[in-house]
Swiss-Prot record:
It catalyses: 2,3-bis-O-(geranylgeranyl)-sn-glycerol 1-phosphate + CTP + H(+) = CDP-2,3-bis-O-(geranylgeranyl)-sn-glycerol + diphosphate. This is CDP-archaeol synthase. GO terms for molecular function: CDP-2,3-bis-(O-geranylgeranyl)-sn-glycerol synthase activity. GO terms for cellular component: plasma membrane. Pfam families: CarS-like (PF01864). It is a multi-pass membrane protein. Its cofactor is Mg(2+). Catalyzes the formation of CDP-2,3-bis-(O-geranylgeranyl)-sn-glycerol (CDP-archaeol) from 2,3-bis-(O-geranylgeranyl)-sn-glycerol 1-phosphate (DGGGP) and CTP. This reaction is the third ether-bond-formation step in the biosynthesis of archaeal membrane lipids. HAMAP family: CDP_archaeol_synth. The chain crosses the membrane at residues 3-23, 53-73, 77-97, 126-146. Its EC number is 2.7.7.67. Belongs to the CDP-archaeol synthase family.
Length: 164
């Protein structure tokens, strides 16, 4: 496994998923689901998934996610954009599933919370480029550890209301 290629592949989704929380600092936020409920009477995604968070995640995931490629070209800027968007769609899917399971916003749901974004990014990438199985396995192993550490940091920095 080429560690630089692996890092270049997971970095845009990590940045996109991790930076979306910065929207929580904004005074006005607009939920992606506009407060609407699904047919089961529960919110589609909840107040934690906002257009502002998606925008911040896509922009930072694309730009900051692309930076390692300036040293060693592995991905294009378009790849970083696609991986960032896919990661945030994976996070939205995870929120949708959690709402269907009657889990409130912020409730921990291992491994859904930790893997939804990275697995969606890998799935979408695999639709147009080769993603070695060992990269998917490695991402599935390291992501929960990194996710936990970054969530604790975001909690300490008061960017998140809970450390998970």
């Amino acid at each position: 496994m080429d560690l630089f290629v692996f890092f270049a592949l997971i970095w845009p989704p990590y940045v996109a998923n991790g930076s979306a929380v910065l929207a929580s600092r904004l005074k006005w936020r607009h939920p992606v689901d506009f407060g609407h409920n699904f047919v089961d009477g529960r919110r589609l995604f909840g107040d934690g998934k906002t257009y502002e968070g998606l925008a911040i995640g896509v922009v930072l995931g694309t730009v900051v996610g692309y930076l390692p490629n300036l040293l060693h070209p592995t991905l294009t800027l378009l790849d970083a954009l696609i991986l960032s968007v896919a990661a945030l769609l994976g996070d939205l899917l995870g929120a949708f599933i959690k709402r269907r399971l009657c889990m409130p916003r912020g409730h921990p749901a291992f491994p859904l919370d930790q893997l939804d974004f990275i697995l969606m990014a890998m799935l979408v990438r695999s639709l147009y480029a080769d993603v070695p199985v060992e990269y998917i396995i490695a991402a599935s192993v390291v992501t929960p550890i990194i996710h936990r550490a970054t969530n604790i940091a975001a909690y300490i920095l008061r960017l998140k209301k809970e450390p998970w």
